[in-house]
Amino acid sequence: HLWLVRKKDGKLQVLLQRRAKHKESFPDRYDTSSAGHIPAGSDYRESAIRELFEELGVHAKAEDLVYCGTRRVVYDGEFCGKPFHDRQVSKVFYLWFDADESAFNIDPAEADRVLWMNLDACIDGVRHNTFPHCIEMDELEILCSGLKVDFA
């Protein structure tokens, strides 16, 4: 998972993308700047920059991504009304990137808009579920660790 980060008016901001309305999982919910599944054996950084370009039209270099940590998910239950078994290993990265929301070339198959949000407001909103999202608190904690900022 790749987070685009910038500093604006002295505060850290993260770019969120709102998933497209037709997506089977989490439609109309805000998510990580860019994320995707990678083929077995593929490089995490190369996959992250490929997804970033496909989803948002942003070119980046693998060496510019800052590694924050690894997130593991093991889930057995129900999702979208069907039995679901999820096994994920996600590498969490961030990339310093400052551009207006209108500058992104959003793939409508993936998302319908992007939004810069202050990091502390994002954490608070996810914690208290005050905006539609599919962001996990543990991922924000990993991001904050990589950014070397307090996870409030």
Show the residue positions of the predicted features:
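Conserved beta-strand and immediately adjacent loop positions that scaffold enzyme active sites
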Residues: H1, Q13, R113
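Acidic, metal-coordinating catalytic segment for phosphate/diphosphate chemistry
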Residues: H1-D9
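Short arginine-rich
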Residues: L2, V58-K61, H128-C134
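Short, flexible active-site-adjacent loop segments at beta-strand->alpha-helix junctions, enriched
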Residues: K8, A20, R71
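Secondary-structure boundary elements
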Residues: D9, G57-K61, D100-A103
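Conserved Nudix-box catalytic region and its N-terminal flanking loop in Nudix hydrolases
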Residues: K11-V58
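Nudix hydrolase/Nudix homology domain
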Residues: D28-Y30, S34, G69-A152
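A short coil-to-beta-strand element that immediately follows conserved catalytic motifs
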Residues: H59-T70
